[in-house]
């Protein structure tokens, strides 16, 4: 089975995130995508709140998609969330006979060498990297450009910002078209202050 893992803050999840999931399902022949809202990020100060809300939004968006699972594996974990640790848990749950993929943005690939056990990660899974549509200036290390376990997609990266959405909600601006209409009211209620 081909399993893609899509971790992130999803603070909140928006249409751009959904389009990436749709693209991977339709074009890369995945059997399953596991959406994992981060618990405590390892790469920045913990300014994430509303874990339950972020999880609820993701679940609501994908509740009718049998190929998408939303997991609380990192939210329930103690301490900082590391992709390496999460992947090992998922391999234990689903079995090592499956093929695992990690979905990331080009900015994450640029910093991959700072990730915990990144070389071992590259042996345990393949990385699906979405390039940003408007930013071709990010330099990618040759080690990654020539690695068979890194798939760089020159596909449009759906450039919507969760920060932009939170700011619009705080300023009582319309977020239609930026978030799934199924969760628009929930986002407006939960992110108002």
UniProtKB/Swiss-Prot annotation:
The entry's keywords: ATP-binding, NAD, Nucleotide-binding, Nucleotidyltransferase, Pyridine nucleotide biosynthesis, Transferase
Gene3D superfamilies attached to this UniProt entry: HUPs
Entry EC no(s): 2.7.7.18
Catalytically driven reaction(s): nicotinate beta-D-ribonucleotide + ATP + H(+) = deamido-NAD(+) + diphosphate
SUPFAM superfamilies reported for this sequence: Nucleotidylyl transferase
Function: Catalyzes the reversible adenylation of nicotinate mononucleotide (NaMN) to nicotinic acid adenine dinucleotide (NaAD).
Protein family: Belongs to the NadD family.
Protein name: Probable nicotinate-nucleotide adenylyltransferase
Provenance organism: Fusobacterium nucleatum subsp. nucleatum (strain ATCC 25586 / DSM 15643 / BCRC 10681 / CIP 101130 / JCM 8532 / KCTC 2640 / LMG 13131 / VPI 4355)
